[in-house]
Regions:
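Active-site microenvironments in enzyme catalytic cores
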Residues: 1-12, 17-21, 29-232, 239-244, ...
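Short, surface-exposed secondary-structure edge patches
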Residues: 79, 134, 251-253, 303-306
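Residue-level recognition of short, solvent-exposed, well-ordered loop/turn junctions
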Residues: 83, 256, 308-309
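A beta-strand-loop signature enriched in Asp, Gly, Thr, and Trp
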Residues: 212-264, 268-280
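Active-site pocket scaffolds in enzymes
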Residues: 261-309
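Structural signal for terminal/edge beta-strands and the immediately following C-terminal loop/tail
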Residues: 313-336
Length: 336
């Protein structure tokens, strides 16, 4: 099934079911007022939601209305936890290669992960607002999952059953603030402002055979100012599956229902080399930083600028029939 959170003036919005074709929506306060409320009692709420979802897709719910993604929050407007991994080690390897650093062997066996701010996410069509372009504004197109209650020490096998919903992410990053921040040895904070998520979150069964092995095997499409920037396949070159990321996060702590785990920037090796931009016939990249990294490797310096005020970023994933699965993250960068 497909779920969204509609804006109603409150912090957490109203939970709604969205039809498979993203055309219709219906609020479900009789089951749960918010997505978090549904997640807290998923075993009870999910069967009732599935029943209504079937009726919605059959056109049997007279109270359904047209679904307008502009009226949608991120599925969880705020969350108990947002932990973003770096499952595509190719991305990390390229960044290190560009600065002449070797790749530690453990990066292939032990995932990187940071804990981001989750007290308030951007809506999928909100502007990305900052006072200064010089901060190095960038997008990161990713896939994320929402978990149920995950016990500490969960096994890989059990972790996959805790993937309740999937969605897309724009992990907004401020590249020029990150180096000084990381040099302190205490992780991201200012360099990782509020992220945004797709208008709709979907259960794994909606993805059919594209969801297998704890990975989503479909291209993740990013456009910048209407031009294709990247369409790498999210299931290719994903070193760590979502169950692996969940188990990593839960090694020393339990994860509450509603925890969001991100994949990190989707990145494909493209024939074993640094790859090619989409404009040159390659699958391109899911963030500007990776394209700049490849430019540095090949030409000695980066030439693609980071985002500027007025730039528009769109992130979307289509099924095999060309239909949008999650709706689009569609944001414009603007000056505060």
């Amino acid at each position: 099934m497909k779920l969204a959170t509609l804006k109603d003036g409150s912090r957490d919005g109203n939970l709604a079911l969205v039809s498979r074709d993203l055309s219709r929506a219906v609020a479900v306060p009789e089951i749960a007022r918010t997505l978090q409320e549904a997640l807290d009692a998923w075993d009870v709420a999910a069967p009732r939601l599935e029943q209504l979802y079937a009726q919605l897709n059959e056109g049997k719910l007279a109270r359904a209305v047209a679904f307008d993604p502009r009226q949608a929050h991120s599925p969880l407007p705020r969350a108990y936890q947002w932990a973003d991994g770096s499952a595509y080690v190719n991305h990390v390897e390229l960044v290190r290669q560009a600065r002449g650093a070797t790749m530690p062997a453990e990066f292939w066996t032990d995932p990187l992960m940071y804990q981001g701010g989750s007290d308030g996410f951007l809506a999928p069509m909100d502007d990305i607002v900052f006072p200064d372009e010089s901060w190095g504004i960038d997008f990161e197109a990713e896939v994320a999952v929402i978990t149920g209650d995950v016990p500490m020490g969960v096994t890989l096998q059990a972790a996959e059953s805790q993937v309740l919903l999937l969605m897309l992410v724009n992990d907004v990053s401020l590249r020029n603030l990150i180096p000084a921040e990381l040099s302190k040895g205490f992780g991201f904070f200012q360099g990782k402002p509020a992220s945004s998520f797709s208008p709709v979150a979907v259960t794994p069964d909606e993805l059919g055979g594209a969801w297998r092995g704890g990975k989503l095997h479909l291209p993740l499409i990013t456009t910048l100012n209407g031009a294709l920037f990247g369409h790498p396949n999210a299931g290719v070159d994903m070193t760590f599956s979502f169950p692996h990321l969940i188990a990593h996060a839960a090694k020393t702590r339990a994860l509450a229902a509603g925890t969001i785990i991100g994949s990190g920037t989707v990145s494909n090796k493209q024939g074993g080399g640094p790859g090619r931009p989409a404009a040159s016939g390659g699958v391109g990249y899911s963030c500007i930083a990776e394209q700049r990294t490849v430019e540095t490797i090949l030409a000695g310096q980066a030439s693609t600028p980071f985002l500027r005020f007025g730039d528009r970023v769109r992130i979307e994933m289509l099924d095999d029939g060309g239909h949008s699965i999650f709706g689009a993250i569609d944001q414009t960068v603007s000056k505060s």
